[in-house]
């Protein structure tokens, strides 16, 4: 929702302050295929394994989402 940096529905999330819906100090992310222990995973880390004729998808190092490869 507007103004929220993370999903504050789970008070047990170590990356997100459940009272403010903001990332805790030092956290880059709270969830996502490219988020590990509140930090973005390194660029080039496989986040989605290829299926069929598709290719693997990789983290970009600057977001928690797993961008789809353009091929």
Swiss-Prot record:
SUPFAM superfamilies: Blood coagulation inhibitor (disintegrin) (SSF57552). It holds the Pfam family Disintegrin. A motif (Cell attachment site) lies at residues 51-53. PROSITE patterns: DISINTEGRIN_1, DISINTEGRIN_2. Residues 1-71 form the Disintegrin domain. InterPro entries: Disintegrin_CS (IPR018358), Disintegrin_dom (IPR001762), Disintegrin_dom_sf (IPR036436). It is found in: Secreted. Belongs to the venom metalloproteinase (M12B) family. P-II subfamily. P-IIa sub-subfamily. The disintegrins belong to the medium disintegrin subfamily. This is Disintegrin halysin. The lineage of its organism: Eukaryota, Metazoa, Chordata, Craniata, Vertebrata.
């Amino acid at each position: 929702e507007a103004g929220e940096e993370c999903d504050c529905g789970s008070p047990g999330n170590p990356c997100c302050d459940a009272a403010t819906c903001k990332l805790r100090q030092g956290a880059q992310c709270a969830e996502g295929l490219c988020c590990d222990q509140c930090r973005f995973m390194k660029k080039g880390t496989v986040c989605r394994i290829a299926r069929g004729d598709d290719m693997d998808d990789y983290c970009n190092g600057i977001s928690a989402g797993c961008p789809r490869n353009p091929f």
